[in-house]
């Protein structure tokens, strides 16, 4: 009887337009936590959706949310569909999928033109290798730890506009499979590359044209990146004050 009741509720929810419209990050995070408590893997949460007239997680209207930091933090079973979320207003995605160890869903069409902070966005998202090649990251100032321990990530990000980025600490730290082309990244504004490729064991891509004249910290940039043997002889390191190897 309980099974059929839940099934009926689920069917009804699918037929009802999503109405949940969070206005801030706190409201979104609270709703995500409640939904995933019921159905951790996909966010269908039929009881939560019906009782609050919210609809399923993937259908929520996130148009007004600016702060998406930690929304799926440690959601280690989640791999639901959030491809239809409107994230155009978002400015902060710090740790959004940090610890979401199974997440690998399609977010290729997200509009990120206002995002400035991608700290630890996919930290420890060790299943993530989805297509994010067309993301607009032109206003992002920090890529610190973005793919830290994203151990299988190796997708194409060659066309990203990184001209506003000023910090790349731990960006690919322990991104063990990463060896994608980042040769054309604009790094002219970057001032710190501490442990950027630390233990990125597969990495050996061309970085010869990177502009690092503003960088002051190169501590362990290629520490334990055992395959890296690229030509960086023309790098301008005049401002570097820390360069442990």
Model-assigned labels for residue ranges:
Residues 4-245:
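Negatively charged
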């Amino acid at each position: 009887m309980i099974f059929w009741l839940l099934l009926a509720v689920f069917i009804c929810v699918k037929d009802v337009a999503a109405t949940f419209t969070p206005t801030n990050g706190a409201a979104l995070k609270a709703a995500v936590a409640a939904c995933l408590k019921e159905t951790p893997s996909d966010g269908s949460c039929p009881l939560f959706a019906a009782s609050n007239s919210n609809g399923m997680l993937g259908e929520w209207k996130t148009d007004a949310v600016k702060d998406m930091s930690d929304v799926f933090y440690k959601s280690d079973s989640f791999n639901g569909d959030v491809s239809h979320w409107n994230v155009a207003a978002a400015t902060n995605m710090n740790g959004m999928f940090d610890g979401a160890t199974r997440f690998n869903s399609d977010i290729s069409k997200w509009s990120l033109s206002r995002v400035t902070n991608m700290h630890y966005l996919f930290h420890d998202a060790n299943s993530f290798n989805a297509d994010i090649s067309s993301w607009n990251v032109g206003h992002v100032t920090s890529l610190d730890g973005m793919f830290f321990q994203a151990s299988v990530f190796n997708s194409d990000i060659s066309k990203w506009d990184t001209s506003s980025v000023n910090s790349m600490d731990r960006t690919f730290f322990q991104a063990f499979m990463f060896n994608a082309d980042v040769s054309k990244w604009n790094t002219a504004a970057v001032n710190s590359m501490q442990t950027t490729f630390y233990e990125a064991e597969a990495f050996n891509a061309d970085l010869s044209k990177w502009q690092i004249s503003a960088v002051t910290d190169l501590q362990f940039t290629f520490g334990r990146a055992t395959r890296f043997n690229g030509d960086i002889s023309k790098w301008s390191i005049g401002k570097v004050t820390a360069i442990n190897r």
